[in-house]
């Protein structure tokens, strides 16, 4: 049967389908379990590379193994692609021909005229072995392929065709047309770059026998929580459109397009048009960015020598220099073979070494740049024994290349008072001898200092980050015990040591006059002092409630233990994550379970702790004389600090909802609320807004926002696909997150949920021999990701404590610039 041109119409494909399959012997008897191998004499086609002439042509193949009338969906698809070919700039237009005659795949001259082939087929065997061999030869010659919806059911016994389409539908996929939300995660591919981030549309959604994620590059996923996916559901990661470079050519598949109405949609036609631009060689695209085999994770540091921390201390943060060196710190825990001193009568109680190591990419060697004597080495044990103080954070001056200034956030051992069990926390500036990679400890300039209690562990925070204006952000923990509140709000005012509460975070995180439980923002000056930038939460000069009850350094209040923060210097947006309390389940009496939290912070704000968590879910108040008795629920819109340990304002700023929160039960837990806005906190009534993550043991570990540098010549930089995506992780590596998420700029500052998330666990590998215990991650100037693995112990370093690097090795976009088609003029 001859090919038809773009304006022709013919009916009755059933005659060809029946004849073709009888000729192939495929209608006689039951289906074979495997396809016969093609006759070698039928696989010697020679198709010019790349196929297609000066003017771009697209072949639509709509053959089907089923008998009957021509499908209206196929007709709609053909008409839509014809329309697409006539649209857009002249240089992006193309000619369309359609056929149901599979003999075109054995005609090398005719097949070689087409830049891309579109399969609008139904299921079943639609090609003979020789015809499939012709299609394979076409792809090997750098041809393009687009499969639409039921094309994934074609050639069911061919492993090669399975690879071409990427996945096979599950037999029990729902057949009903349902409206669902598609998460459009690739904002650069021509098939998706102009689509809504959250694309709501009806279709017949397919489930997959095997999830193709990691083997293909997924450009869009369907959100299963928005429709009924049935028993064969794929879960939170449900790819619906993807692409990859395959067998010498380019393959794009979409599971959408299963309805006639799909082809009437402007956005769906734009989706197909972008797929065709890439497969016809009219545009380049990166279809390698999320294929896990394109990444390499390598350990950069060796295990320490016995009894030494020559390679790494107890990992607690890292930063990269413009020349590629990686500076990373050890908090203060010693090698496990060394004794620790926990007796407060001993002047050396808790004494440890906060180490700064430097890994040099030129030599691939490690230098111990310096050691600070810190309070931070008491080993493990209960909360009145262990300690999380020490060397907590590191940053390099924005002009580090010229001045060699290094900023350290730490607790000096010289500043402890064993009698009162108080200590001094400080942020200091040191100068590095750049020739020797050694810190000049005598160069210290103390910028900022404040008191912390050290009678009880925990929650020191520690991360620091710069914005583009030279403002330094400093994350501090609530300096509070995890106990005495049954794992709910840390608001028990009773426990204290010599008058200082250590179980009431209203003294710290909820206190407008205390620097603990905050993210501070200051502007360091060259003389070692600092000024306060405009736009902090307070000026420090407020006269409310008598005055003298605020600190101007506070940018964010109400955070519990923000170990890691980052700032996207392109937007100066702050990203933070903090660890939550310990309650394993929600309580209708006391409030939410432990929520670990991530937030996009676009302005000074109160993030809630210890009054509210998540999306403004309140805790129950408690107070003297009997903190075991619940009082009223906190008002997240107008919180009050009525703790006897508060020396700040009573009336606090309203709480801003957070973007990501998770508990042992799941991600984004929420509950029905009563007329006062109080959730029921009944576990059986919980719903989960973020099904892609879950807690258990959990410790949020905020990461960077990746920014692609097109001018960089680095061969290891991550692709542009990741540009603008925010990396969120957890110390633990089971159900806990290790994901890249896409936020909507319109809603992210007000607690908007991520619109898209994808797992990084096969790229930043989990497991005992991988990066099991994530302790920090940042991109370097080379575009590679540098990661700290804490190791397998606690309060010490061990053989698994290490610095890692994750690089991209997949190559650039395809097709090569020299293979781009000219297009119709």
Predicted regions and their residues:
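Asp-box/WD-like beta-propeller blade repeats and closely related beta-sheet repeat scaffolds
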Residues: 421-465
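A glycine-rich, often tryptophan-bearing local segment used as a flexible ligand/cofactor-contacting loop or short
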Residues: 119, 124-195
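Extracellular ligand-binding/catalytic regions of CAZymes and related secreted enzymes
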Residues: 37-53, 226-228, 232-240, 244-290
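Beta-propeller domain segments
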Residues: 286-292, 334-354, 380-384, 389-391, ...
């Amino acid at each position: 049967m001859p090919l038809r041109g773009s304006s022709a119409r013919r009916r009755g494909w059933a005659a060809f389908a029946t004849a073709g399959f009888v000729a192939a012997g495929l209608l006689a008897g039951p289906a074979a379990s495997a396809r016969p191998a093609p006759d070698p004499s039928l696989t010697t086609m020679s198709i010019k590379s790349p196929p297609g002439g000066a003017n771009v042509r697209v072949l639509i193949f709509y053959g089907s193994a089923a008998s009957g009338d021509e499908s209206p969906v196929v007709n709609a698809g053909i008409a839509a692609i014809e329309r697409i070919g006539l649209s857009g700039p002249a240089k992006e237009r193309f000619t369309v021909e359609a056929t149901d005659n599979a003999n075109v795949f054995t005609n090398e001259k005719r097949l070689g005229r087409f830049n891309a082939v579109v399969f609008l087929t139904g299921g079943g065997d639609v090609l003979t072995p020789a015809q499939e061999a012709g299609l394979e030869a076409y792809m090997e010659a750098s041809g393009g392929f687009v499969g639409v919806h039921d094309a994934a059911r074609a050639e069911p016994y061919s492993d090669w065709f399975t690879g071409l389409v990427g996945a096979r539908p599950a037999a029990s996929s729902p057949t009903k047309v349902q409206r669902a939300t598609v998460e459009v995660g690739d904002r650069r591919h021509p098939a998706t770059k102009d689509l809504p981030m959250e694309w709501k549309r009806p279709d017949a959604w397919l489930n997959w026998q095997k999830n193709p994620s990691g083997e293909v590059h997924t450009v869009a996923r369907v959100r299963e929580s928005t429709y009924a996916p049935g028993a064969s559901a794929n879960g939170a990661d449900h790819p619906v459109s993807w692409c990859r470079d395959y067998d010498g050519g380019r393959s794009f598949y979409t599971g959408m397009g299963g309805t006639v109405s799909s082809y009437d949609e402007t956005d769906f036609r734009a989706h197909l048009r972008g797929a065709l631009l890439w497969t016809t060689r009219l545009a380049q695209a990166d279809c390698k960015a999320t294929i896990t085999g394109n990444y390499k994770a390598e350990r950069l540091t060796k295990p320490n020598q016995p009894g030494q921390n020559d390679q790494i201390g107890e990992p607690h943060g890292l930063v990269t220099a413009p020349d590629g060196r990686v500076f990373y710190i050890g908090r203060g825990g010693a090698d496990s073979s060394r004794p620790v001193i926990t007796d407060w009568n001993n002047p050396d109680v808790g004494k440890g070494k906060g180490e700064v190591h430097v890994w040099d990419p030129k030599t691939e060697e490690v230098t111990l740049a310096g050691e600070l004597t810190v309070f931070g080495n008491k080993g493990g044990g209960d909360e009145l024994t262990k300690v999380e103080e020490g060397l907590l954070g590191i940053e390099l001056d924005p002009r580090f290349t010229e001045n060699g200034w290094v900023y350290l956030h730490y607790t000096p051992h010289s500043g402890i008072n064993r009698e009162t069990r108080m200590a001094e926390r400080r942020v200091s500036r040191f100068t590095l001898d750049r020739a020797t990679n050694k810190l000049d400890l005598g160069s210290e300039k103390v910028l900022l200092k404040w008191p912390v209690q050290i009678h009880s562990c925990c929650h020191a925070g520690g991360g620091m980050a710069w914005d583009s204006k030279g403002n330094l952000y400093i994350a501090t923990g609530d300096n509070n015990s995890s106990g005495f509140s049954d794992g709910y709000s840390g608001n028990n005012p009773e426990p204290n040591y010599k008058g200082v509460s250590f179980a009431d975070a209203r003294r710290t995180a909820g206190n407008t006059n205390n620097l603990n439980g905050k993210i501070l923002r200051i502007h360091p000056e060259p003389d070692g002092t600092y000024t306060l930038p405009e736009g902090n939460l307070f000026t420090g000069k407020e006269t409310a409630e008598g005055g003298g009850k605020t600190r101007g350094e506070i940018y964010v209040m109400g955070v519990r233990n923000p170990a890691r923060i980052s700032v996207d210097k392109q937007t100066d947006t702050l990203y933070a994550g903090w660890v939550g309390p310990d309650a394993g389940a929600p309580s209708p009496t006391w409030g939410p379970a432990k929520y670990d939290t991530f937030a996009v912070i676009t302005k000074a704000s109160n993030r809630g702790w210890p009054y509210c968590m998540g999306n403004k879910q309140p805790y129950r108040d408690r107070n003297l004389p009997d903190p075991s008795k619940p009082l009223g629920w906190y008002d997240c819109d107008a919180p009050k600090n009525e703790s006897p340990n508060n020396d700040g304002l009573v009336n606090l700023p309203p709480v801003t909802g957070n973007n990501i929160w998770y508990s042992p039960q799941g991600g984004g837990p929420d509950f029905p609320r009563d007329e006062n806005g109080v959730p029921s906190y009944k576990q059986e009534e919980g719903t989960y807004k973020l099904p892609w993550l879950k807690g258990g043991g959990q410790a949020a570990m905020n990461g960077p926002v990746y920014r692609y540098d097109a001018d960089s010549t680095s061969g290891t930089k991550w692709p542009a696909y990741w540009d603008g995506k925010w990396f969120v992780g957890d110390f633990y590596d089971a159900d806990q997150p290790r994901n890249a998420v896409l936020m909507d700029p319109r809603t992210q500052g007000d607690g908007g949920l991520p619109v898209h998330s994808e797992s990084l666990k096969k790229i930043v590998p989990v497991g005992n021999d991988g990066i099991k215990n994530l302790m920090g991650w940042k991109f370097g100037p080379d575009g590679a990701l540098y990661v700290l693995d804490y190791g397998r112990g606690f309060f010490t370093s061990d053989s698994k404590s290490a610095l890692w690097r994750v690089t991209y090795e997949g190559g650039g976009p395809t097709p090569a610039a020299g293979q781009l088609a000219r297009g119709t003029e």
